[in-house]
A protein has these predicted regions:
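Non-catalytic alpha-helical scaffolds and adjoining flexible linkers that form interface surfaces
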Residues: 1-24, 29-131
Length: 131
């Protein structure tokens, strides 16, 4: 396994898709590496301790193995949970979709990461009438 490196980063999950029986493919937005695609093996199993934290709008600290274009998630820790409801939830998903559409893979944008975090904090605070 030469050429592999382990990285640790703050990250937000923009989207997750089922992969095989027990895994997920994650699209994550990281502070220093931008948009990444990760494989989270075994997280859909009933005994998985990480399944409950792999949700959109949660600030996570992730560790991953960088082997190829598809990286392997090694560990995840929940740092901050943004709870979005009703219209705020739809706005959050729309922002996630925009990020996925316009960001290039592995193109760092730390300033946009901070702005995204601010948007989520604001959406979590406001009532639907204010959005």
């Amino acid at each position: 396994m030469t050429g592999s490196s382990i990285y640790a980063q703050p990250a937000y999950i923009l989207q997750h898709k089922p992969y095989r029986e027990s895994s997920l493919i994650l699209e994550v937005f990281t502070q220093d590496f931008g948009l990444l695609t990760l494989l989270a093996k075994g997280v859909r199993k009933a005994k998985s301790r990480t399944a409950g934290v792999l949700l959109p709008f949660s600030l996570l600290h992730i560790s991953y193995l960088d082997r190829h274009e598809l990286k392997l998630l090694l560990d995840v820790e929940l740092l901050e949970q943004h709870v979005l409801a009703r219209l705020s939830l739809y706005c959050g998903f729309y922002v996630n979709e925009l990020l996925q559409r316009f960001l290039q893979l592995q193109d760092p944008n730390p300033e946009l990461f901070v702005r995204y975090q601010q948007v989520l904090q604001q959406l979590a605070r406001v009532q639907d009438a204010e959005v």
